[in-house]
């Protein structure tokens, strides 16, 4: 039987030494939301708990300021 090697997930923000996630950095935030607009959980992305909280806060702020959509485009 073939065994599949699961790659260990790592926190991108920890490795890059990010101090705080900015809500104005839309390019980064878009990588952490689904096509339907939901925030991707940390067990999928590998983000640490500290940065997951900052990420959620930044996404919610960006949504409130209409920088990011709450849902998909409904096309």
UniProtKB/Swiss-Prot annotation:
A cellular-component GO term for this protein: cytosolic small ribosomal subunit
Keyword annotations of the record: Ribonucleoprotein, Ribosomal protein, RNA-binding, rRNA-binding
NCBIfam families in UniProt: S18
UniProt gene name: rpsR
Subunit structure comment from the entry: Part of the 30S ribosomal subunit. Forms a tight heterodimer with protein bS6.
Example GO molecular function: structural constituent of ribosome
Family: Belongs to the bacterial ribosomal protein bS18 family.
Pfam family, any one: Ribosomal_S18
GO biological process: translation
Record-given protein name: Small ribosomal subunit protein bS18
Cited Gene3D superfamilies: Ribosomal protein S18 (4.10.640.10)
Described purpose of this protein according to its UniProt entry: Binds as a heterodimer with protein bS6 to the central domain of the 16S rRNA, where it helps stabilize the platform of the 30S subunit.
